C-alpha cells in the first residue's frame, strides 16, 4: 500500500499550504482573510484544513466551508453572497460577522455562528472568489484540477448523495467561471493532479 507521501494530490496540497503560509506571513494583517475557490473535488477543503493546522500567525484561525452555507443544490451563487455579506464584509470592517448553517436534510437554515473579527478567517468553497471578495480578501486562492479527477474525488467522498447532483452543480460552477473569472482574481493558483 502506498504511503501518503506517495500521494501526488496530498503532496501538491502540502506544497501549496507551505507557499500560502509564506504569503500570509508577508502580510501586515494580524487577522487576514483567505478565500479558497475551485471546482468540486479540487481539494479546497483539504487545503483549508492543512493551512489551518499550520497557520503561520499567532493565534487561531476560523475556517468556514461554503458547504455549510449553500442553500441546497441550486445555491452556489446564493451561498457565496451569504458569505460575502455575513462574513467577509463585516470582518473587513472589524465587525463581528455571522452566518447560518444550512441543514441539508431538513432543507432549511439552522443555527447561527459568529465570526470573530480579531482572528484570521479562511472561507473555502466553490464560488467564493469573485470581484466582491477580491476587494476584501488578503489572499485569494484558485485550486485547479481536471474534471475527471475532481469528479472521482467528489464522488468517492460523497458517493450516492452527490452523484445525482453532479451535473446540476457543475453547471453552476461553469456559470461562476464565466461570470466572475476567479482564476484571474487569484493571488495564487494551486494545481492539483
Question: Where are each of the predicted segments found?
Answer:
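Extreme N-terminal, non-catalytic leader segments
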Residues: 1-34
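P-loop (Walker A) phosphate-binding loop of NTP-binding proteins
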Residues: 39
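Conserved lysine of the Walker
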Residues: 44
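Hydrophobic positions on the alpha1 helix immediately C-terminal to the Walker A/P-loop
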Residues: 47
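Post-Walker A helix-loop "phosphate-sensing" segment adjacent to the P-loop in P-loop NTPases
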Residues: 53-62
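Conserved nucleotide-sensing/catalytic segment adjacent to the nucleotide-binding pocket
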Residues: 62, 68-121
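Small-molecule kinase domains that catalyze NTP-dependent phosphoryl transfer to phosphate-bearing small molecules
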Residues: 108, 112, 130, 159-193
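ATP-dependent NMP and nucleoside kinases share a basic, alpha-helical "lid"
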Residues: 111-156
Amino acid at each position: 500500500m502506498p504511503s501518503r507521501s506517495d500521494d501526488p494530490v496530498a503532496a501538491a496540497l502540502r506544497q501549496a499550504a507551505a507557499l500560502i503560509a509564506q504569503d500570509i506571513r508577508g502580510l501586515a494583517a494580524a487577522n487576514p482573510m483567505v478565500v479558497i475557490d475551485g471546482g468540486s473535488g479540487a481539494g479546497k477543503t483539504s487545503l483549508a484544513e492543512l493551512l489551518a493546522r499550520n497557520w503561520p500567525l499567532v493565534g487561531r484561525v476560523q475556517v468556514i466551508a461554503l458547504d455549510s452555507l449553500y442553500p441546497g443544490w441550486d445555491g452556489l451563487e446564493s451561498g457565496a453572497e451569504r458569505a460575502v455579506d455575513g462574513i467577509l464584509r463585516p470582518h473587513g470592517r472589524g465587525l463581528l460577522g455571522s452566518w447560518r448553517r444550512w441543514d441539508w436534510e431538513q432543507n432549511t437554515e439552522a443555527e447561527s455562528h459568529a465570526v470573530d473579527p480579531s482572528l484570521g478567517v479562511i472561507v473555502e468553497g466553490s464560488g467564493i472568489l469573485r470581484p466582491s471578495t477580491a476587494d476584501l480578501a488578503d489572499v485569494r486562492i484558485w485550486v485547479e484540477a481536471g474534471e475527471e479527477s475532481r469528479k472521482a474525488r467528489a464522488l468517492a467522498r460523497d458517493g450516492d448523495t452527490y452523484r445525482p447532483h453532479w451535473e446540476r452543480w457543475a453547471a453552476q460552477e461553469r456559470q461562476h467561471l464565466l461570470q466572475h473569472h476567479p482564476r484571474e482574481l487569484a493571488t495564487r493558483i494551486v494545481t492539483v493532479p
